[in-house]
């Protein structure tokens, strides 16, 4: 009961926080620093046994808050979310060390370096070398260090639920902020293009991605942490509210990623559950479907049917659009051409964007981390991708009972292919898949036998 009250209080607090940030965006800076010092204090003062958990909670919270802090200008820098995750995992390494079995991720980090030297000779004179390199490599470095720290770290299912809760709480605050920012969607949506106003005044792609993460986390919570009917209704309602605003950003990537990850999660969760638990899963699945269907109908109603046209790949007049990928396929092909032209050392970090500026007059950032990695890192990029894809399968082979592995890997893979690594989120999600998740051992209670006097 006490846990449920604490959970509801945390939701209420973050909902109010979203309102306060809407009323006064200057509160974003104090919010950022209070959260930062709070988690630093928790990590430093934690016992050795709980320090890994505290590090992961800190990372999770700032992953969930990253887009909200960008929206409200609360971060000290645009890439602060990635830098803080790097800071926290480095602290974790200092206190807890790393597994020797994770050495391929050290190789992965080393293979990022040659592209910097190549970029020093290929980037145009007008390009800002330091900021361009930092923007492109901060995500991959964040992933590599997070993976090094998390690889084979033993953690319980209850602890990973806590980590996911810390990740979704700031997303709840962000959702509240968006509702107050745009209370009436009909006022701002007039086409099927991605809508910045409906996304709370920030890039719809990033907002859709982070709200998609919220959908995924709340769906998991609905199945694993909803012991009572009121909690089931509460979690299903929050899921519906997040989903509604994710859909109405008119950016499809985050929503599709979330739904795919939820389906994969349910498959493995159901498969690893006992017969009695499976009956409960089926009933909750019905509640999930009702919540999502109701949300869809509300979104269609509030947008005058434009959401339906968007997901059917049509414009506001109902005409079929030429491309389903909204220009991403052209970017992908261009980056593959870069790989073919420089297959050994690549074209250099950030050069793909730089080339688009020279050729088209505008530097559209890559949406696919795979094609960007191949183009900018060459043969080293091929090895990097092989490490990222195949190394996790080793830990999966040693822990087949972890039903979070494939959903997390799927979420990472789909995210980096629709928005690259603009956020710290895909890096941290990937690292979570490398944790060695086990059931908690129940303490054995033995009766003490007293010697009887004769």
Give, region by region, the residue ranges found by the protein language model.
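N-terminal signal-anchor transmembrane segment
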Residues: 1-95, 115-121, 411-413
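Helix-loop-helix junctions and helix-breaking kinks within/between transmembrane helices
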Residues: 19-32, 71-79, 131-135, 201-208, ...
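Transmembrane alpha-helices of multi-pass inner-membrane enzymes
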Residues: 42, 405-414, 420-454
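Aromatic-anchored transmembrane helix interface
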Residues: 77-91, 102-121, 125-152, 165-168, ...
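Alpha-helical transmembrane segments of multi-pass inner-membrane proteins
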Residues: 145-146, 159-189, 202-271
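Flexible juxtamembrane loops connecting transmembrane helices in multi-pass membrane enzymes
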Residues: 195-197, 277-284, 294-330, 354-357
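Hydrophobic transmembrane alpha-helices and their immediate junctions
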Residues: 263, 375-415
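Long extracytoplasmic/lumenal interhelical loops at the membrane interface
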Residues: 313-377
